[in-house]
């Protein structure tokens, strides 16, 4: 018999200490990594539930195990909410991650060796869009597209590459691009050569759900996303489609199970269902609008302080600082800001002379700070503090002073009150 009062603290002090330290770190550090966010206690309640005990290979109503009558309800709720939220008529909520979702799409639509047009990782793309170190770059013939001198996606070049190489699939989406993607234009290019358009909207799914960023679902053959990041749910993946192509939907389902995965994580699927319901609330739209406002407000401060922002601004939740002119590396900036309890990530910038392990830039995102209640006034102050640190990267007195301000504002805006 398992006793409900069993706990980690009394059993595994070493593990519990690390968990508690991470809890403190999240409360006392300002989180600006664009792909990170804080999920709600409701989501965590679902993830810590007895649903974790249940094997449920297959799909609702078509399971390989008995005893699935209640997890069927859970998964169907998640499916229905995903379809409603994004205007899709197909949803698969089983992928364990965004990368797993992407892998399933490749498996469903392509054969190894097929040509794929994807955004260059060094110019804002993602590992799974064709990086040579990733399965996508190893199994498929990847042709990269990128951005023009203004920092915007170069659709003219994309169309030329498509016409020249005749890819079977074109990938839209990004991990470090601050603009708005023209999904309709990408579909037009894909249709001109008979290619699939696959969009990975992981970074902007929350903005899309709230109507703050254009929805790719009406334009793409297939769309994937993570359920964390701007969507603020559990760590996991999701596949969506629209258009009624039942043959495609069957291929996608088979590519997830049994091709790529076995049993789904039912506790995580329940958490996805909760997060999708939260994303339908009016306050979620207000939150996403503030995410976009906060990113713009931060950009304004950095530009006024003489910092170069890739593309000169942002139209979503993130932006890149190009530190080449400041003679700083992304690695140095990341470390100095970290000492002031401000968490960012080093990131390559267009035509970066440094390696991906050093880089010449940092990526900054507003979802997490907005989640804890920061508005324009707070993020402008924060951006100023970041400039103070970057202007005095070797001055520990300045860094300590900023750290004190960070601790103060974190206490005033707790993540979990």
From Swiss-Prot:
(6S)-5,6,7,8-tetrahydrofolate binds at residues 121, 125-127, 355-357. It holds the Pfam family SHMT. InterPro entries: PyrdxlP-dep_Trfase, PyrdxlP-dep_Trfase_major, PyrdxlP-dep_Trfase_small, Ser_HO-MeTrfase, Ser_HO-MeTrfase-like, Ser_HO-MeTrfase_PLP_BS, SHMT-like_dom. One of its GO terms (molecular function) is pyridoxal phosphate binding. The keyword Amino-acid biosynthesis applies. GO terms for cellular component: cytosol. It catalyses: (6R)-5,10-methylene-5,6,7,8-tetrahydrofolate + glycine + H2O = (6S)-5,6,7,8-tetrahydrofolate + L-serine. Its EC number is 2.1.2.1. GO terms for biological process: glycine biosynthetic process from serine; tetrahydrofolate interconversion. Pathway: One-carbon metabolism; tetrahydrofolate interconversion; Amino-acid biosynthesis; glycine biosynthesis; glycine from L-serine: step 1/1. It is found in: Cytoplasm. Transmembrane segments: none annotated. The modification N6-(pyridoxal phosphate)lysine is found at residue 229. Its cofactor is pyridoxal 5'-phosphate. The record marks 228 as: Plays an important role in substrate specificity. PROSITE patterns: SHMT (PS00096). Belongs to the SHMT family. Homodimer. This is Serine hydroxymethyltransferase.
């Amino acid at each position: 018999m398992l006793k409900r009062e069993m706990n980690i603290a009394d059993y595994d002090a070493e593990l519990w200490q690390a968990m508690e330290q991470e809890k403190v770190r999240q409360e006392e550090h300002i989180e600006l990594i664009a792909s990170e966010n804080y999920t709600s206690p409701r989501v965590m309640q679902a993830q810590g539930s007895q649903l974790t005990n249940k094997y449920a290979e297959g799909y609702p109503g078509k399971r390989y195990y008995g005893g699935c009558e209640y997890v069927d309800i859970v998964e169907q709720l998640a499916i229905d909410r995903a379809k409603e939220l994004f205007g899709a008529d197909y949803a698969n909520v089983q992928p364990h991650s965004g990368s797993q979702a992407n892998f399933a799409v490749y498996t469903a639509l392509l054969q190894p060796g097929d040509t794929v047009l994807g955004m260059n990782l060094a110019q804002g793309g993602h590992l799974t869009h064709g990086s040579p170190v990733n399965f996508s770059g190893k199994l498929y013939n990847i042709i990269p597209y990128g951005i023009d001198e203004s920092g915007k996606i170069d659709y003219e070049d994309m169309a030329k590459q498509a016409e020249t190489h005749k890819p079977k699939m074109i990938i839209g989406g990004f991990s470090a691009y601050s603009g708005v993607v023209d999904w309709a234009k990408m579909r037009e290019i894909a249709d001109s050569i008979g290619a699939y358009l696959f969009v990975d909207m992981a970074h902007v799914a929350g903005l899309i759900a709230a109507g703050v960023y254009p929805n790719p679902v009406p334009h793409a053959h297939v769309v994937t996303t993570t359920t964390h990041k701007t969507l603020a749910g559990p760590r996991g993946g999701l596949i969506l489609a629209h258009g009624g192509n039942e043959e495609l939907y069957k291929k996608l389902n088979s590519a997830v199970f049994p091709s790529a995965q076995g049993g789904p994580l039912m506790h995580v699927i329940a958490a996805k269902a909760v997060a999708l319901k939260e994303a339908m609330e009016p306050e979620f739209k207000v939150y996403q609008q503030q995410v976009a406002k906060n990113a713009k407000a931060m950009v304004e401060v950095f530009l006024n302080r003489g910092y170069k922002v890739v593309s000169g601004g942002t139209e979503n939740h993130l932006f890149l600082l190009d530190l080449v002119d400041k003679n700083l590396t992304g690695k140095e900036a990341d470390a100095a800001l970290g000492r002031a309890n401000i968490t960012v990530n080093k990131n390559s910038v267009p035509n970066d002379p440094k390696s991906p392990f050093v880089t010449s830039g940092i990526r900054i995102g507003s979802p997490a700070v907005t989640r804890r209640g920061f508005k324009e006034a707070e993020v402008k102050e924060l951006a100023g503090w970041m400039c103070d640190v970057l202007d005095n990267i070797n001055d520990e007195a300045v860094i300590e002073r900023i750290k004190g301000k960070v601790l103060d504002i974190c206490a005033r805006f707790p993540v979990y009150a």
